[in-house]
């Protein structure tokens, strides 16, 4: 994928587009895949990088949502379990099945959670994974040798999906591109245009790198900006009521030795009513999450001290080695774009159902939902958009549409396995220049070749793009990422022909950002 080529296409494309999508997270890119694969002309604009917001900051789970069973939302769980199955089918190089263990310390927990998780398994139907069952104390410790043993009676095992969110997203961008969509990062929508009848018929947008502007018309404009959906709606109506209730969740990343296992821990009920996970991820341990209501969404949310303390304390109740602040390699925060529901008193109680909302102006906003259900959200949105835009009705094909790279061997678990079929091309880069086969840092699994690949083929434009989202270095080890940032900046500078001052500016910006991921 080449950004300059897509910018040229955006400028020369005959007007109007069938659909213009604002927002380059999982929802927006999912809509682009669905619409383009139906044969519609699609332009997607993202003012920062793909996945800069919520979509790179999830708990990395492709799951039905165990806690929604407790809320009685059987429909949501069943739908999400189907979508989990489709993700495993269509992106086997990125999404995988792993065991989750529920430790039982009271006599009633084994039958209670065992029954609930059996229902969870049954709701998946033909998309089910492994069989859930009750484990003895000894079996528990074989699954999770680092589990706290004091008072441990038994456990329950069930199976769910895990993935790398930002890696899946960039492969989704490539999928949409292959289906004919034009997708541009670092292009900000600065205004919406209206017809004489007062309906939205296009956008004004600015290329953040060059300052150039374009006016693009469309039969339908779709707002897929997640936690920032209300901001876009207010470009049309400054007095539009809020539909999004943002909630912050944080995650801590620890060394892999805290789990020393390919299995995850699931704590069904924490003090704030959420589920807490400790998950093996890229040979590290990911622990989260919290639920902190926010007044406003921010692009770069920061973990609060009380959230950090809560995660450490709760994890310490289940792990044999109690983690401390000194053990935290990285901390990151994400914002859930929950749709407001007046009858709910806490964000932890809100559902993750999605909404496709049409303003009087004709602006379509797709809101809510969660990562696992992005495909279904997109299908519903495109169905509505086709009606609004008076487009020819065409069936959705995404249930069986493979995600870019899926032709690779999902059984191969090398450092490049997440690239799927692209891994062979990265290995060719290394054969052409053996220096590219060097690790960027001994504590991280990433190669110099991955930086080159990200810039040449995955629309990476900054040091942050590479270290936060094309690789996950910043999320795995913030201090190591700061150490390798100058080398990464040099590689990008050579690829994009940056002047020294531009290189230094990008490096400084990344170092400022990385400070938010460090505890000490």
Regions picked out by a protein language model, each given a short descriptive name:
Residues 1-19, 34-38:
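Extreme N-terminal leader/targeting segments of oxidoreductases
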Residues 14-17, 210-220:
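Core beta-strand elements of the Rossmann-like FAD/NAD(P) dinucleotide-binding domain
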Residues 16, 20, 48, 94, ...:
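C-terminal accessory subdomains/tails of enzymes that are appended
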Residues 21-22, 216-226:
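Short hydrophobic core segments
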Residues 28-29:
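N-terminal Rossmann-fold NAD(P) dinucleotide-binding loop
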Residues 36-57:
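Glycine-rich FAD pyrophosphate-binding loop
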Residues 60-143, 276, 411-412:
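Dinucleotide-binding Rossmann-like beta1-alpha1 core, especially the glycine-rich loop
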Residues 185-201:
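A conserved short coil-to-beta-strand element within the FAD-binding core of flavoproteins
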